[in-house]
Amino acid sequence: MDGTRTVLDIKEYSDSEVQKNRVLTLEEWQGKWVTGKTIFHQEQGHQLLKKHLDAFLKGESGLKVFFPLCGKAVEMKWFADRGHSVVGVEISELGIREFFTEQNLSYSEEPIIEIPGAKVFKSSSGNISLYCCNIFDLPRTNIGKFDRIWDRGALVAVNPGDRKRYVDIMLSLTRKGFHYLLAVLSYDPTKHAGPPFFVSDAEVKRLFDSVCNIRCLEKVDALEERHKSWGIDYLVETLYLFTEK
């Protein structure tokens, strides 16, 4: 019956090319931190991650977990507190400093020799290292490989024209037996230019299907009052789990 339809039944916008030429510069991203326009930050952490944490971690301990475009994600502290080693990358030094301050963590900083002007910030406990640099420069560092990747607010923030390059870097960082958890957003991209950018199911398959098993864990209605200022009337968040083929 039509009366039982929800936003999750809305047919996904079919043209993933609408935003393909949209570009946000690194300076614009840094400006969002300076002006406090960081509504993408979730102070309580990500609810779908909490719900599917067991599927992600599989009961394993001592994992190495990567947070691309990490901002000041509180989940980094969650994983560190559970005995895992956390590495993140973020272009905003302000965002990184805010993370350590808000989590009451002491830290040190040192230059990244391979990337002029870049720094790495390390918690005094040694289990959180946050690289302040362009994520596309990351392959120049000896950052190692990861058991887990938590990609929330990263793929949807990367300029659409850079997605393939970004995904290639992410997959190059994975260890055998990896689990990669990805959250993406679906809405009408003719009504909102992004970021966050619209990422379709077909796009996810195009980017990951050749090397990953793809499992859709959940789709949820993510529309909040603040999103209506974007001009959209629906927003669906989809959580995917990728594993090694």
UniProtKB/Swiss-Prot annotation:
HAMAP family the UniProt entry points to: Thiopur_methtran
Protein EC: 2.1.1.67
Provenance organism: Equus caballus
GO biological process: methylation
Coiled-coil stretches: none
Subunit structure: Monomer.
Family: Belongs to the class I-like SAM-binding methyltransferase superfamily. TPMT family.
PANTHER family, A to Z: THIOPURINE S-METHYLTRANSFERASE (PTHR10259:SF11)
Keywords: Acetylation, Cytoplasm, Methyltransferase, Phosphoprotein, S-adenosyl-L-methionine, Transferase
UniProt cross-references to Pfam families, sorted A to Z: TPMT
Identification of the protein by name: Thiopurine S-methyltransferase
Chain residues that bind S-adenosyl-L-methionine: 29-40, 69, 90, 152
InterPro entries given in the database record: SAM-dependent_MTases_sf (IPR029063), Thiopurine_S-MeTrfase (IPR025835), TPMT (IPR008854)
The organism's taxonomic lineage, starting at the top: Eukaryota, Metazoa, Chordata, Craniata, Vertebrata
Domain of life: Eukaryota
